[in-house]
């Protein structure tokens, strides 16, 4: 007899050991580190490599605060403004090949990012559409099960629609504000570049000045001018010509203040009324003084300074005829051309010789009229027969 059977017979109760326990499952290996995303823009040096852009130019662009992501998000017009600022602020000689090379590098990088992110974006958009469709189906199923839309649901949906409308209007207002800031920055850079060109030689064209607008920020409301006689106060909410000429005297005082502060700090002081003077005037509260308006009537102020009697007579004549200020402004050109004829049609010398006009740039239109008068005078002199002796 087997001893185990005897033990089993003597002790009917014993532990049932059962099958052996399985071995513990080893933990899964840690996931590999995620690869760097391929749709991230490269550094600016890598982006322009091979496109003929010098490293010194890249360094200047970086000093202005531009990165590769910023340049990729900019439009062609904004790129032109950036290059103009680079040439105006740093006096940097940007080569023609560098301009085209930078644009070509940005186009290539945009194409690379679009090709890399297109597939991933398509996958995400598909899953997003599926999720949205599932939500719509679940909402319809709940509505069908409950027998329609209740009053509470209707009220909540109306409130949600109002909130979305408010969010949309706020987003549109924010977009307009950002666009206005960009336009103001672009205008400031264009004005700075125009002043640099004026200092090198010659003033800016009147069409550019009139289309440039009033500069950044909101100004106080400026009422229109009317033709008034000397000493006459304009009625209603309008300003007379004496007030207009007073603005030019204020600009001269602001220029003196800017020059004294520049000398005090050891900076280069302007010799003419530039954007620096207009910005200072706005800073001290004289926001009614702006560059387009002052450049628009500078030849009228010149006639007032050079020949005050002729200016007063012209004002009285146009006031008696009921002409507007635009017609009076155009009529101020002819006396100035006659004055320049006494000095060899050199209107720049006429401005430079007068202490109150030397701080203003000669309008391009006035310079053109003097040049045409000089040409006509020379042609008429050449057509005369020689004297007989």
Curated annotation (Swiss-Prot):
Keywords: Activator, Developmental protein, Differentiation, DNA-binding, Flowering, Nucleus, Transcription, Transcription regulation
Single GO cellular component term: nucleus
Main location: nucleus
Keyword Cell inner membrane among UniProt keywords: no
DNA-binding region (UniProt annotation): 221-225, 290-297, 361-364
Tissue specificity field: In very young panicle but not in mature florets, mature leaves, roots or apical meristems.
Ranges of Acidic residues composition bias in the record: 190-201
Annotated region (Disordered), positions in chain: 1-41, 140-226
Gene3D superfamilies (alphabetical): Protein LEAFY
Feature: compositional bias, Pro residues: 19-39
Localization terms from the record: Nucleus
Compositionally biased region (Basic residues): 159-180
GO annotation (BP), single: flower development
Chain span(s) of sequence motif Nuclear localization signal: 161-168
One term of GO molecular function: DNA binding
Residues flagged as site, Interaction with DNA: 268, 275, 279, 326
RNA-binding listed as a keyword: no
Disruption phenotype: Several abnormal phenotypes in the vegetative and reproductive phases including short plastochron, late flowering, small panicles, reduced meristems size, aberrant floral organ identities and loss of floral meristem determinacy. Reduced panicles size is associated with reduced number of primary branches due to the precocious formation of spikelet meristems.
InterPro entries: FLO/LFY_C, FLO_LFY, Floricaula/leafy_C_sf, LFY_SAM
Protein family per UniProt: Belongs to the FLO/LFY family.
Function: Probable transcription factor. Together with APO1, involved in the temporal regulation of meristem size and identity during both vegetative and reproductive developments through interaction with APO1. Promotes flowering.
Complexes and interactors: Interacts with APO1.
Protein name: Probable transcription factor FL
Gene: FL
């Amino acid at each position: 007899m087997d001893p185990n059977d005897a033990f089993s017979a003597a002790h009917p109760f014993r532990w049932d050991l059962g099958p052996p326990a399985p071995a513990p499952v080893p933990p899964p290996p840690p996931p590999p580190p995620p690869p760097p995303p391929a749709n991230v823009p490269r550094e600016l040096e890598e982006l322009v490599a091979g496109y003929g852009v010098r490293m010194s130019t890249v360094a200047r662009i970086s000093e202005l605060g531009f990165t590769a992501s910023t340049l990729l998000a900019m439009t062609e017009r904004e790129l032109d403004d950036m290059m103009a600022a680079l040439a105006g602020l740093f006096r940097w000689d940007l080569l023609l090949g560098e301009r085209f090379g930078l644009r070509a590098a940005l186009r290539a990088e945009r194409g690379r990012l679009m090709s890399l992110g297109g597939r991933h974006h398509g996958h995400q958009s598909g899953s997003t559409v599926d999720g949205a469709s599932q939500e719509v189906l679940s909402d319809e199923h709940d509505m069908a099960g409950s027998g329609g839309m209740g009053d509470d649901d209707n009220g909540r949906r109306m409130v949600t629609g109002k909130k979305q409308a408010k969010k949309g209007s706020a987003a549109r207002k924010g977009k307009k504000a950002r666009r206005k800031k960009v336009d103001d920055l672009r205008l400031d850079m264009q004005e700075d570049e125009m002043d640099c060109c004026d200092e090198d030689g010659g003033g800016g064209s009147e069409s550019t000045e009139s289309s440039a607008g009033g500069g950044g920020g909101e100004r106080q409301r400026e009422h229109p001018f009317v033709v008034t006689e000397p000493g006459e106060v304009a009625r209603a909410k309008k300003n007379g010509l004496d007030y207009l000429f007073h603005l030019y005297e204020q600009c001269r005082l602001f220029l003196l203040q800017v020059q004294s502060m520049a000398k005090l700090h050891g900076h280069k002081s302007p010799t003419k009324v530039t954007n620096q003077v207009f910005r200072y005037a706005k800073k001290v509260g004289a926001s009614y003084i702006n560059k387009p308006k002052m450049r628009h009537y500078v030849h009228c102020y010149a006639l007032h300074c050079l020949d005050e009697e002729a200016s007063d007579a012209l004002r009285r004549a146009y006031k008696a005829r009921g002409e507007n200020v635009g017609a009076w402004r155009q009529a101020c050109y002819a006396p100035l051309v006659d004055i320049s004829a006494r000095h060899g049609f050199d209107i720049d010398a006429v401005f430079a010789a007068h202490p109150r006009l030397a701080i203003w740039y000669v309008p391009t239109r006035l310079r053109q009229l003097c040049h045409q008068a000089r040409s006509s005078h020379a042609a008429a002199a050449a057509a005369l027969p020689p004297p007989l002796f």
